[in-house]
UniProtKB/Swiss-Prot annotation:
Disulphide bridges, residue numbers: none
Keyword Secreted applies: yes
EC class of the enzyme, as a word: hydrolase
UniProt tissue specificity: Milk.
Sites bearing Pyrrolidone carboxylic acid, chain numbering: Q1
Biological process, per Gene Ontology: regulation of defense response to virus by host
SUPFAM superfamilies in alphabetical order: RNase A-like
Compartments (UniProt record): Secreted
Protein name: Lactogenin
Family annotation (InterPro entries): RNaseA-like_dom_sf
Length: 73
């Protein structure tokens, strides 16, 4: 698989299916590996599915659990 795809998986996929609450959002925001975190993305989405559930979606349309994150001012 390509380098960009692997980067996407690292930054946006949470295979443990956690998330959806303020603690998760704040913790994941702190753990984003950006050189200039304050100049980074103001909106982000995490996918909460394991590989088995995600694989069909990688190839075709489907539904997954996600958490949308926005930077707090």
């Amino acid at each position: 698989q390509g380098r960009m795809y692997q980067r996407f998986l690292r930054q946006h996929v949470d295979p443990d299916e956690t998330g959806g609450n303020d603690h998760y959002l704040n913790l994941s925001r702190r753990n984003i590996q950006c050189p200039n975190r304050h100049e980074g993305v103001r909106f982000n989405t995490d996918i909460h599915e394991d590989l088995t559930n995600r694989r069909p979606i990688d190839e075709h349309e489907g539904v997954v659990r996600v958490t949308d994150k926005t930077e707090e001012g």
